[in-house]
A protein has these predicted regions:
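Amphipathic, well-packed alpha-helical segments that form the structural scaffold of globular domains
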Residues: 1-4, 23, 73
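Catalytic loop of the DD-peptidase/beta-lactamase superfamily, centered on the K-T-G motif
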Residues: 10-11, 27-32, 36-44, 54-186
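Conserved N-terminal glycine/acidic-rich loop preference
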Residues: 21, 46, 50
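Active-site-proximal loop and beta-strand segments within enzyme catalytic domains
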Residues: 1-15, 32
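Short amphipathic alpha-helical face segments that pack within enzyme cores
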Residues: 17-24, 70
Length: 186
C-alpha cells in the first residue's frame, strides 16, 4: 500500500511509487508484464541489446551507454509514440508546484513532465548551465543520468560507477557544460 505524503497537485515530491503505479496500469491495460512490454515495445524496435529490467520499472533498469544514447535519440526524435504524447511528456505539468530535486534542493517552481524532470530555471542544476530551459531528463541513485535538450537536439548520458552523492552534485554541471561545448565545437 502506498502512503501519500501530500495531496496530488500540492507539492512535487519525486517518488518511485508513481512509476511503479504507471507500470502496474500498463500491465493491466496490456495483459503483459512490464519487462516484456518494454522489451517488445522499446528495446527491440530501438535495438537496445543491453537493456534489462529485472524488478521495479522505477529503479531496476540497466543498460550500457551506447544503448542509453539510442534511447536519448528516441526521446529527441520520437518514432515509437505519437507526437502528441511526446509533447505532453516533455511539457511542464502543474507549473506552479514547489518541489525538491534530490541532492540539489528545493526549487520554486520545480517543473516536471511525465516521468522526467524539466530543467526550467533551476540553478544549480545537474544539466549544462547553457542548455535550454526545455532540457529534460532523469538521474538516479545509481549515479547515472540521461538528458535531452529538445530545442537543440543535444543529448548526453553518463553511466556511473558509484551511487549518487556529493561528487555527482559537484561535477555533473561542469561535465555537462563541457559536453555541450564539445557538441557545439567550442
Amino acid at each position: 500500500e502506498t502512503h501519500l505524503q501530500r495531496a496530488p497537485g500540492e507539492r512535487r515530491i519525486y517518488s518511485n511509487a508513481g512509476i511503479e503505479v504507471a507500470g502496474q496500469m500498463l500491465e493491466e491495460a496490456t495483459g503483459s508484464p512490464i519487462s516484456r512490454w518494454i522489451e517488445e515495445s522499446v528495446s527491440e524496435p530501438l535495438g537496445l541489446a543491453s537493456l534489462e529490467i529485472e524488478g521495479s520499472p522505477a529503479y531496476s533498469g540497466r543498460a550500457n551507454a551506447a544503448d542509453l544514447m539510442l534511447f536519448a535519440r528516441e526521446l529527441a526524435h520520437p518514432t515509437l509514440i505519437s507526437t502528441q504524447l511526446a509533447s505532453s511528456a516533455q511539457s511542464i505539468h502543474f507549473p506552479e508546484l514547489t518541489g525538491i530535486v534530490p541532492g540539489y534542493g528545493n526549487y520554486r517552481p520545480c517543473p516536471w513532465g511525465l516521468g522526467c524532470e524539466i530543467k526550467g530555471d533551476k540553478n544549480p542544476h545537474w544539466t549544462a548551465p547553457q542548455s535550454s530551459v526545455a532540457t529534460f531528463g532523469h538521474f538516479g541513485q545509481a549515479g547515472s543520468f540521461l538528458w535531452v535538450d529538445p530545442l537543440s537536439a543535444e543529448r548526453a548520458v553518463f553511466v556511473g560507477e558509484r551511487p549518487f552523492g556529493q561528487w555527482h552534485h559537484d561535477h555533473w554541471g561542469p561535465l555537462n557544460s563541457q559536453i555541450v561545448q564539445a557538441m557545439r565545437g567550442q
